[in-house]
């Protein structure tokens, strides 16, 4: 199942008795406030992003539950040595403009090994993160087709009868990873996704409407790619 990685941003977190109690649900012995460092990940929201995708509100709520207990890695490397923090709570926060955002609260122990990471976070040097998951459905905003089952002719970012096409990412199939990463060198870095969400290949005669012949060919070429990988 294809993985989608979305950029997230680290924020300062306050530690109180209630938060410490949530942290201690993840530990083998009770930790004190002086033993832990906490931070927040301002992750996905329900707005259309630069990839012309948005998470549904129900999916954000699912993610808030599914990511609790997952480790926070370094540079997408899966090993015990790169596990530097853990998610202890998740929630969906609303703003006045109607935006709903997934916020993951994380902790790490204060040790000699984690001291450089904590210093990098506190100084603002290390503040980028990616959140990885697989979704059950990718629904076209124009026709409603689930791209995991069949390909429609609509392309994200193109306009159809005054409406810009985007994909609604709906339902959490799996929560894979959270990873602290370096600042991306390119604006589009940090995204891994299936070009057409693992759906069926389009029939040879199928073309998106309104596009020039060269654009149609590019669309078909992209549909044949299984993954696009722009790593940090």
Residue positions per predicted region:
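Short linear motifs in low-complexity, proline-biased tails and propeptides
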Residues: 212-224
């Amino acid at each position: 199942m294809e993985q989608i990685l979305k950029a997230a941003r680290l924020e300062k977190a306050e530690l109180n008795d209630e938060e410490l109690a949530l942290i201690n649900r993840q530990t083998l012995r009770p930790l004190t406030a002086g033993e832990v460092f906490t931070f927040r990940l301002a992750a996905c929201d329900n707005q259309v992003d630069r990839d012309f995708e948005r998470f549904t509100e129900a999916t954000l709520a699912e993610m808030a539950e599914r990511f609790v207990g997952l480790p926070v890695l370094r540079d997408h490397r899966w090993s015990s040595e790169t596990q530097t923090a853990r998610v202890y709570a998740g929630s969906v926060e609303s703003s006045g403009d109607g935006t709903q955002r997934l916020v993951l609260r994380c902790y790490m122990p204060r040790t000699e090994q984690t001291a450089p990471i904590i210093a990098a976070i506190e100084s603002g040097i290390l503040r980028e993160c990616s959140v990885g998951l697989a979704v059950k459905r990718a629904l076209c905003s124009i026709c409603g087709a689930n791209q995991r089952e069949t390909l429609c002719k609509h392309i994200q970012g193109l306009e159809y009868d005054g409406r810009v096409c985007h994909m609604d990412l709906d339902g959490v199939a799996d929560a894979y990873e959270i990873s602290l990463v370096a600042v991306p060198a390119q604006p589009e870095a940090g995204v891994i996704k299936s070009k057409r969400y693992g759906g069926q290949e389009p029939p040879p005669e199928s073309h998106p409407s309104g596009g020039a012949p060269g654009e149609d060919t590019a669309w078909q070429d992209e549909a044949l790619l299984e993954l696009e990988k722009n790593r940090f």
